[in-house]
Amino acid sequence: MKKRRSKKERQELLQQTIETNPFITDEDLAEKFQVSIQTVRLDRMELSIPELRERIKHVATKQHEEDVKSLPLEEVVGEIIDIELDRHAISIFEVKVEHVFKRNQIARGHHLFAQANSLAVAVIDEELALTAKSTIRYIRPVKLGERVVAKARVEDVENDKGRTVVKVRSFVGEELVFTGTFEMYRSSNYSEEGNNL
C-alpha cells in the first residue's frame, strides 16, 4: 500500500509541478496527487498560486501582436502564449464542441495540424513564411474539453536550400499527442513567379 504524502510534501511537489507545467489544470493535479480538486485549490491558495487562467495570462505578458510578422495573430490557431522569433513558440488550443466529431467527441485532426502549422509559420522572423513540406504524426486522439499545448522549436536553418526546419510537439497535460516537422520557405527566398518553391 502506498504511503500518503504529508501536506507539506504534497504542496512542495504541487508547486514544482506547476512551475514545470504552468498549464496543468486543477483536475490533472488532483488526479496526479490522488486528492480532491478542492484540496488542490486550497493548496494553491495557501501557496499563493493563481488559477490556470491567471497563470496563462502571466506567461503571456509579451505583446505578441508586435512579435509575430508572418501572419496576423487572429490567423493563428490557438492562443500564442510565448514566442521568440526564429527560436521557439508555444500556443494553447482548447478543444470545443465545434472542433470534434459529434458521434465520438474526438477532435478533428485538421485542428491539431492547423495549430501546429500556424505556430510553425508564426515563429519565422519574416513577413512571409510558407510551408513547403510537413511530416506529421497523430499519437493519440484528443477529446472534447482537452487543452492542447503546442511547442514549436526552430531546429535548422538551411541557408543553401533557403528553408527553415521547425519541429512542433503537442501535448495534453504531459502526454504527447501530436508531432510535426515543417520545412518552411522564408520571404527572402520567395519569388513572385514561384521559382524558388
Curated annotation (Swiss-Prot):
Which one GO biological process term can you cite for this protein?
negative regulation of fatty acid biosynthetic process
The entry's keywords: DNA-binding, Fatty acid biosynthesis, Fatty acid metabolism, Lipid biosynthesis, Lipid metabolism, Repressor, Transcription, Transcription regulation
InterPro entries the UniProt entry points to = HotDog_dom_sf, Thioestr_dom, Transcription_factor_FapR, WH-like_DNA-bd_sf, WH_DNA-bd_sf
Checking CDD domains in the record gives: hot_dog
Q: Name one GO molecular function term.
A: DNA binding
Quote the Pfam families the UniProt record gives: 4HBT (PF03061)
Per its database record, what is this protein's job? Transcriptional factor involved in regulation of membrane lipid biosynthesis by repressing genes involved in fatty acid and phospholipid metabolism.
Q: Which family does it belong to?
A: Belongs to the FapR family.
Q: What's this protein's name?
A: Transcription factor FapR
